[in-house]
A protein has these predicted regions:
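N-terminal signal peptide c-region/cleavage motif recognized by signal peptidases
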Residues: 14-16
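Sequence context surrounding c-type heme c attachment/ligation sites in exported
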Residues: 20-80, 84-152
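Sec-dependent N-terminal signal peptides
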Residues: 6-9
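Positively charged n-region of N-terminal signal peptides that target proteins for export
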Residues: 1-4
């Protein structure tokens, strides 16, 4: 009985450590990093749902104001992988308006204490620049223990 209590307590105490982790799947195709991370962070696919990823990947010719078109074979490979690994957690599974994570309910809730001018700091530049503040964002760790908001 005591062991069960201690085990339950340990699991409960560890929950906040894993609460903000959306790991990058180990089977990420090299094309995802090569194509997507050449302009921005290669976001863990679990941060958005299937419909968002499908919409993003079918609209690469107008990808947030840029033509990000890629070879059809690579597009299919990346799309299939993103959909396979898309959000399953309730927190991330709602549609992100305009396919922007930064407009999703979970993102707004997580960042509601930040003023609008924070995103304009030279060290951040954009709300989509996760790695500016979340030092382990590339591995899917968005926890506050690794958070460091640039002062400028």
């Amino acid at each position: 009985m005591k062991n069960n209590f201690l085990l339950s307590l340990a699991v409960f105490l560890a929950m906040p450590v894993y609460a903000d982790k959306t790991p990058m799947p180990s089977d990420a195709p090299k094309s995802y990093e090569a194509e997507c991370a050449s302009c921005h962070m290669a976001f863990p696919p679990g941060l958005m749902n299937q419909k968002n990823w499908q919409s993003i990947m079918t609209g690469l010719s107008k990808h947030f104001g840029t033509d990000a078109s890629i070879d059809a074979k690579l597009q299919t490979e990346i799309t299939n992988w993103l959909i396979k690994n898309s959000a399953i957690k309730q927190k991330y599974s709602a549609m992100a308006p305009d396919n922007r994570m930064t407009k999703s309910a979970w993102f707004i809730k997580e960042h509601d204490e930040l003023k609008a001018d924070v995103w304009k700091r030279a060290g951040i530049k954009s709300a989509a620049n996760c790695m500016a503040c979340h030092k382990d964002a590339a591995s899917g760790d968005f926890s506050e223990r690794n958070l460091q908001v640039p002062a400028k």
